[in-house]
UniProtKB/Swiss-Prot annotation:
GO CC, alphabetical: cytosol
Protein's UniProt keywords contain Lyase: no
Gene transcribed to yield this protein: lysS
Protein name from the UniProt record: Lysine--tRNA ligase
The organism of origin for this protein: Haemophilus influenzae (strain PittGG)
Binding site for Mg(2+) 1: E413, E420
Gene3D superfamilies recorded: Bira Bifunctional Protein, Domain 2 (3.30.930.10), Nucleic acid-binding proteins (2.40.50.140)
């Protein structure tokens, strides 16, 4: 018999015993009571009483009602020490036969298993080891767990099981709970920041007839009542800019985007983005906003501007570096023989890319080739927080052209730890230029570029009504959460990541 078969046999045996206990509970009446009310969380008790002297605490006779899942139990004859876990943390219980009504210790407490959810009433005291504990006087089983918890000494170590059965991961791993608490604080902090700056939170369509706002492959679905193919949105950008045209001059949205692309440690097909738009601002203002926001999040969440991620340490209290895409490519590509002139001539750029082993697509112009060279030689060097600026117009179809050099745009990408965290630019508000760039994207799609943008005629019409000078930015919430939680994979910060079917 294999080790796996032995484990399954043991599991089936334990579940059978637990089901028999549940059957006995059903025979007595309500097996899942719902009248117990907790009046305090475990961590609140620790915060208030951990430093309290044991004798003084005993004299106070603090009564509490706590509830949670049984994580450990240690029987000692007529008494049992139990640790329960609630959403805030853990608290120890002292359950003694002599402190409970007759028969309760044997007939009820004796049947409890790890994983069961209980509610108790009692008074606080300190053990000989000075551990805050609840001396229970009333107990109640609230939920009988039919399956055992993962091994208490090794926890849940199988990564795939952690992602597929996130509930077990959250029960077993304190670090995972901490990660998702940090993620929640990131979202709350962003919302608070933009509302304090006078932005209005809005919601735009998830189902779109024309998927716009980014270069990506969309998910396709069909609306039966309208008998029309629709797309899960890849970005809310074009709808948000319509709102600026309509007079809502500061808007933001925190919501999901969908892209029918690969899965990796940095990519999930369903992900959360912040997008915001600010009239009468340019991309320099947005870079300033971003530095301020990330600094504030670090202080609020971590208590410091120092953010540690893997082997790296970032100080969000310092100004972020700002460098153009062309300058970064020359700076970090010098050891590969790249010079400035290679990036301003199509033939030289194409030859340079091919020398680097880049497969140049037929639909690429000079801008796309230069961007591919940057990604090959420079992107992974942008470790410290860096704003990469002045992207080629060819790869920035929604961004405003630079006044001094119309071949590039007033655009930036934020890189931290060699990864793109955000993307923003001064918005293109020239309707005729936008129409021409959409046409160029259509030509690229017809030439085989699956990720080229669709043309949105209605958006062009909106621009023809007049978009004020505006700047907009998108920040990846998942990647920000990875950063503040020091999580190596995007799956670690998404509660239920996309997984291949078994």
């Amino acid at each position: 018999m294999s080790e796996q078969e032995v484990k399954e046999l043991d599991l089936n045996g334990e579940m059978l015993v637990r089901r028999e206990k549940l059957a006995a509970l059903r025979a007595k009446g309500n097996a899942f009571p719902n009248k117990f009310r907790r009046d305090v969380l475990a961590q609140d008790l620790h915060n208030q009483y951990d430093s309290e002297d044991g004798e003084i605490l005993k004299e106070k006779g603090v009564e509490v009602q706590v509830a949670g899942r049984i994580m450990t139990r240690r029987a000692m004859g007529k008494a049992t020490f139990i640790t329960i876990q609630d959403m805030s943390g853990k608290i120890q219980l002292y359950v003694a036969r002599d402190n409970l009504p007759e028969g309760v210790y044997k007939d009820e407490v004796g049947t409890w298993d790890l994983g069961d959810i209980i509610g108790v009433k009692g008074t606080l005291f300190k053990t000989k080891t000075d551990e805050l504990t609840v001396k229970t006087t009333e107990v109640q089983l609230l939920t009988k767990a039919l399956r055992p918890l993962p091994d208490k000494f090794h926890g849940l170590t199988d990564q795939e099981v952690r992602y597929r059965q996130r509930y077990l991961d959250l029960i077993s791993n304190e670090e995972s709970r901490r990660t998702f608490i940090i993620r929640s604080k990131v979202v709350a902090g962003i919302r608070e920041y933009f509302i304090s700056k006078g932005f209005m939170e809005v919601e735009t369509p998830m189902l779109q007839v024309i998927p716009g706002g980014a270069s990506a492959r969309p998910f396709v679905t069909h609306h039966n009542a309208l008998d029309v193919d629709m797309y899960l949105r890849i970005a809310p950008e074009l709808y948000l800019k319509r709102l600026v045209v309509g007079g809502f001059e500061r808007v933001f949205e925190l919501n999901r985007n969908f892209r029918n692309e690969g899965v990796s440690v940095r990519h999930n097909p369903e992900f959360t983005m912040l997008e915001y738009y600010q009239a009468y601002a340019d991309y320099h203002d947005l870079m300033d906003n971003t530095e301020e926001l990330l600094r504030k999040l670090a202080i609020d969440i971590l208590g410091t501007t120092i953010v540690k991620y893997g082997e790296y340490e970032f100080d969000f209290g310092k100004p972020f570096e700002r460098i153009t895409l062309h300058d970064a490519t020359v700076k970090y590509g010098a050891d590969k023989g790249i010079v400035k002139e290679d990036l301003y001539d199509f033939d030289r750029a194409k030859a340079t890319a091919e020398r680097l082993g880049i497969e140049v697509q037929k639909s690429w112009g000079l801008g796309s080739i230069v961007n591919a060279i940057f990604e090959e030689v420079a992107e992974h060097h942008l470790i410290q927080p860096t704003f990469l600026m002045a992207h080629p117009a060819e790869i920035s179809p929604l961004a405003r052209r630079n006044d001094e050099n119309p071949d590039v745009t007033d655009r930036f990408e934020l890189f931290i730890g060699g990864r793109e965290i955000g993307n923003g630019f001064s918005e293109l508000n020239d309707a005729e230029d936008q129409n021409e760039r959409f046409d160029a994207q259509v030509a690229a799609k017809e030439a085989g570029d699956d990720e080229a943008m669709f043309k949105d005629e209605d958006f062009v019409v909106a621009l023809e009504h007049g978009l004020p000078p505006t700047a907009g930015e998108g920040l990846g919430i998942d990647r920000l959460a990875m950063l503040y939680a020091n999580a190596p994979s995007i799956r670690d910060v998404i509660l239920f990541p996309a997984m291949r079917q078994k």
